[in-house]
């Protein structure tokens, strides 16, 4: 898409949204498989597919990519608060979640029942020395979410009532919702 055919702010938003979904896809893959090949450039078709056989990246490199992508794109979303599209809040929530996963994996590296399955290449497992940095990134993203007004649904004094109402409240009335699928 050229910048002349669409407003610059919309173009930045759509590009940020595409990068968000790419990072989200990498998050789902790294949780499932550990390190996966990280491809950020468009690949061209060629007769010999050998150059397309990219080796797995370290698990930590995938988490680092997700976190850095969310930091890079968060301002491109502007002040949009649409709960059914990627926004700055959704980017910070994904950063928070990815950093928490990576931080707890690293923190528990030496206690893991699957430690013997970790590959020496780093494709699986994250060394414990990285735990503090990931957990700090998680807390920073959480603080940004709170500063944007996201919080637990607390309309009633009774916690059980709040829990029940959180699922039936209109999306615009629920400060817990960051990124959701809308139903009529």
Regions found by a protein language model. Give the residues of each.
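Conserved, well-structured interaction surfaces
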Residues: 1-33, 49-85
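An aromatic- and glycine-enriched ligand-binding surface/loop that stacks and positions planar moieties
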Residues: 15, 34-36, 40, 63, ...
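Short linear capping/connector segments at secondary-structure termini
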Residues: 42-48
